[in-house]
C-alpha cells in the first residue's frame, strides 16, 4: 500500500518532500494503538502502570529489556534527609527520563524529593510521537505538579528543552511554584522555518527517519512531534511576552546550541526573568553585563572540545552512554577522507567534539554529549537552590 503525499515546503529542518512513500514495516515507524495513561491518582500507580505499558508497547533495541526500561521509565528519588521540598523534572522532545540520570541524584542528595515523568509518546517507538497533542503534555505536567505539591511544602519545576517550555508555562499559571531549573530551554527554535511544522504535519509523516540504535531516546523525529514542540514554544513565548517572571530561575545554555535560539533565551532571561536571585550559566565565549550570568569557555583544545551542544549540558563526563568514550557517539556526516564510515571506530582521543557544524573539516568530529563543567554546574545549582529555599 502506498501513502501519497505532495508538499513543497521547508518546515522545521529544511525538508522538501513531494511524491509517494511506502507504508512503514519497521515497527519503530508504526504507532501504538493509543497513548499510555498518565492521569493516575497517585505517583506510585503511575510508575507501575507506565512500566507495564512500556513492557507491552516498547520496540526493544537489545535483548536487555530491563536496562532499556530503566533508561526510559519515569522514576522517583526519595532523599535520605528530606528538606521538605520537591522537584518535578520534564524531559525534551524525543528524549526520556534518562536526560536526568546525572542531575536527579544530585538534587536528591540536597534533600529534594525528585520525580521525573515520561511525556506521552516517548519511550516506546518513534512513531508514537504522532499520538500526543500539546494538551497531553500540558496535562501530564500539571497533574504531576499537583500530585507532588500534595506531598511536599514547595515544588521546583525543572525542564530540559521542550520540557523547559512546559514547566515555564505552568509556573506562570501557578505563582506558588518555588522557581525554575531550565536546561537548554527551547523557547525559540534556531530554525525560523519551524513555524511551518504544524501545517507540514498534515501532509508529511516524518521530519527524519533514522536507524534506531540509541535506547535512551529516539533518533527519528515524527513531524507531528516537531509540530507539538513548536506549539509548546509558541505558548511559552506568549507568557514571556506578556509578563515578567519574578521567581528564582536557574538556567544553563550553550552559545553554539544547534537546536534552539540560545541568544533569544539569554536575552529573555536578562529582560523578563527579573529575580535578582536568578542565575544563568552560559557555555561559550561571550561575556555579559548581567551579573547574574556566568560564562564558561568551551574553547578547550587540550580536551579536543570546540563548543557545547544542545544535549551536552545535562550529562556528566562519567555518563556511561554519553561520555567521551561512551556507548553512543554522535558522528558528523562529513568527515575527512579515509575516516571509517562509523566514526566510533576512531579512538576517542583522536576525535574533536562540538555542537553540530562546529570545528575544522580536516578533523574527525562528533557532537559533544557531555558537560566538561558538569561538577561546577551542579555546585552552582545546589548553591542557587540553597540560597532560595525559603
Give the location of each predicted region.
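Catalytic nucleophile-loop/oxyanion-hole region of alpha/beta-hydrolase
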Residues: 124-151, 156
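Gly/Ala-rich beta-loop-alpha elbow adjacent to hydrolase catalytic centers
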Residues: 158-163, 167
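C-terminal motif of bacterial Sec signal peptides marking the signal peptidase cleavage site
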Residues: 18-19
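N-terminal cap/lid segment of alpha/beta-hydrolase-fold proteins
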Residues: 34-82
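Short, surface-exposed "cap/lid" segments of acyl-processing enzymes
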Residues: 69-122
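Serine-hydrolase catalytic core
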Residues: 76-81, 221-362, 366-386
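Active-site nucleophile loop of the alpha/beta-hydrolase fold
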Residues: 181-192
Amino acid at each position: 500500500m502506498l501513502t501519497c503525499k505532495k508538499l513543497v515546503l521547508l518546515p522545521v529542518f529544511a525538508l522538501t518532500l513531494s511524491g509517494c512513500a511506502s507504508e512503514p514495516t519497521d515497527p519503530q515507524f508504526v504507532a501504538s494503538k493509543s497513548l499510555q495513561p498518565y492521569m493516575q491518582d497517585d505517583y506510585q500507580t503511575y510508575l507501575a502502570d507506565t512500566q507495564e505499558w512500556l513492557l507491552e508497547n516498547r520496540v526493544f533495541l537489545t535483548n536487555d529489556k530491563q536496562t532499556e526500561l530503566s533508561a526510559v521509565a519515569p522514576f522517583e528519588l526519595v532523599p535520605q534527609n528530606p528538606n521538605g521540598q520537591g522537584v518535578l523534572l520534564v524531559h525534551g522532545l524525543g528524549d526520556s527520563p534518562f536526560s536526568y540520570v546525572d542531575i536527579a541524584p544530585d538534587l536528591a542528595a540536597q534533600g529534594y524529593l525528585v520525580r521525573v515523568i515520561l511525556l506521552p509518546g516517548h519511550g516506546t517507538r518513534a512513531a508514537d510521537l504522532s499520538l500526543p497533542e500539546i494538551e497531553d503534555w500540558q496535562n501530564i505536567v500539571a497533574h504531576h505538579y499537583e500530585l507532588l505539591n500534595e506531598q511536599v511544602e514547595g515544588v521546583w519545576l525543572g525542564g530540559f528543552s521542550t520540557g523547559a517550555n512546559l514547566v515555564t508555562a505552568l509556573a506562570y499559571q501557578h505563582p506558588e511554584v518555588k522557581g525554575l531549573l531550565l536546561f537548554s530551554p527551547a523557547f525559540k527554535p534556531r530554525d525560523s522555518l519551524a513555524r511551518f511544522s504544524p501545517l507540514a504535519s498534515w501532509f508529511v509523516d516524518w521530519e527524519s527517519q533514522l536507524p534506531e540504535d540509541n535506547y535512551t531516546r529516539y533518533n527519528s523525529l515524527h513531524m507531528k512531534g516537531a509540530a507539538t514542540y513548536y506549539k509548546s514554544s509558541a505558548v511559552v513565548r506568549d507568557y514571556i511576552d506578556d509578563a515578567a517572571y519574578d521567581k528564582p530561575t536557574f538556567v544553563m545554555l550553550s552559545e553554539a546550541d544547534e537546536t534552539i535560539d540560545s541568544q533569544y533565551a539569554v536575552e529573555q532571561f536578562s529582560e523578563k526573568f527579573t529575580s535578582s536571585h536568578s542565575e544563568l550559566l552560559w557555555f561559550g565565549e561571550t561575556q555579559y553585563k548581567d551579573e547574574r550570568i556566568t560564562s564558561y569557555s568551551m574553547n578547550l583544545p587540550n580536551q579536543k572540545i570546540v563548543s557545547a551542544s544542545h544535549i551536552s549540558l545535562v550529562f556528566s563526563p562519567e555518563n556511561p552512554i554519553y561520555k567521551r568514550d561512551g556507548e553512543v557517539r554522535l558522528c558528523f556526516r562529513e568527515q575527512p577522507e579515509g575516516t571509517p564510515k562509523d566514526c566510533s571506530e576512531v579512538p576517542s582521543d583522536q576525535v574533536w567534539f562540538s555542537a553540530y557544524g562546529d570545528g575544522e573539516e580536516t578533523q574527525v568530529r562528533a557532537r559533544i554529549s557531555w558537560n566538561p563543567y558538569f561538577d561546577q554546574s551542579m555546585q552552582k545549582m545546589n548553591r542557587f537552590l540553597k540560597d532560595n529555599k525559603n
